[in-house]
A protein has these predicted regions:
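Conserved pre-motif I regulatory segment
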Residues: 1-32
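Conserved ATPase-coupling elements of RecA-like P-loop NTPase cores
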Residues: 75, 121-126, 143-153, 243
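Post-DEXD/H (motif II) to motif III coupling segment of the RecA-like Helicase ATP-binding lobe
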Residues: 130-194
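Single conserved hydrophobic/aromatic residue that forms the stacking wall/gate
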Residues: 277-281, 285-286
């Protein structure tokens, strides 16, 4: 299965962290994976999760909790791009829960990806049969704690009576894992060997330009990158709009993304970036 998935994703080889996660998950214990942002943690849990799903099982087998709707959408898109027989849906605030309920009922997914609050809503209304859920993944667990989702996550876990496996992922090493997670016989994989790994993965360059020439300088810089997907971060929403219009006037395939946009427009921009558009411009705090 993994070979076909990697082909579908156009990935030639897994990294050491992803391979370790897959091998360790086979041991049947709960798993904590610590790895820097951007190191490929999504595949590190989706691949072993897919291997553990049962094709003939009815109902939702796994729940993936995430701190934001954008991350839920991103994971959902990756899952669908894998092109496996299993189905997934995403759920989050900002859109009617009833629409999600109809989607869950129609799709009959094996995996549901969502934010803690919306997941609680569906579980409490029995839109998701808690009796069939045996695996819980909490992606960006450190962010979930930072954003104050402790109570919501504890409530989700408390509604899953047949939970057997837990997989927590984080970009930082917490001093103590809260008891509500219910971790048991846990294996911890730590790939936060930071400086060396970050230097290998990330190159920083500084481009100096007078204020009046910044847009032109940005345009020339982007031209050197070819068709590679690119994120351009701006300080303010107005800057995002201005830069976006400028690049579009230069015939760049460009989308914008900031907190002042309607949810549907934000989702549309994100989907286009994941599948078609090469440049997206989020604010620092979208």
């Amino acid at each position: 299965m993994i070979k076909n998935i990697l082909t579908n994703l156009k990935i030639e080889q897994l990294n050491a962290m992803q391979e370790a996660a897959i091998d360790t998950w086979k041991e049947g214990k709960d798993l904590i994976l610590l790895s820097p942002t951007g190191s490929g943690k999504t595949l590190a849990y989706l691949l072993p999760l897919l291997q553990s799903l049962k094709p003939d099982a009815k109902g939702v087998q796994a729940i993936v909790l995430v701190p934001s709707r954008e991350l839920a959408l991103q994971i959902d898109q990756v899952f669908k791009s894998m092109n496996t027989p299993f189905k997934a849906v995403s759920c989050y605030g900002g859109r009617p829960a009833m629409e999600e309920h109809r989607t869950i009922k129609g799709v009959q997914p094996s995996v549901v990806i969502g934010t803690p609050g919306r997941m609680n809503d569906h579980l409490s209304k029995q839109n998701i049969d808690a009796e069939t859920v045996t695996t819980l993944v909490i992606d960006e667990f450190d962010k979930c704690l930072e954003f104050g989702f402790q109570e919501e996550m504890a409530t989700v876990i408390g509604q899953l009576p047949r939970l057997k496996r837990r997989f927590l992922l984080s970009a930082t090493d917490a001093e103590e894992i809260p008891q509500f997670t219910g971790l048991n016989k846990t294996i911890k994989l730590n790939f936060l060997n930071t400086e060396e790994q970050t230097v290998q993965r990330l190159h920083l360059y500084k481009v100096l330009s007078p204020g009046k020439d910044k847009l032109e300088t940005l345009y020339k810089l982007l031209c050197t990158l070819g068709s590679r997907s690119t994120l351009v971060f701006c300080n303010h929403r107005e800057s995002v709009e201005r830069v976006g219009k400028y690049l579009q006037s230069k015939k760049f395939q460009c989308g914008i993304f900031h907190g002042g946009m309607e949810q549907d427009d934000r989702e549309r921009s994100l989907y286009k970036f994941l599948s078609l558009i090469h440049i997206s411009e989020p604010t620092r705090q979208a």
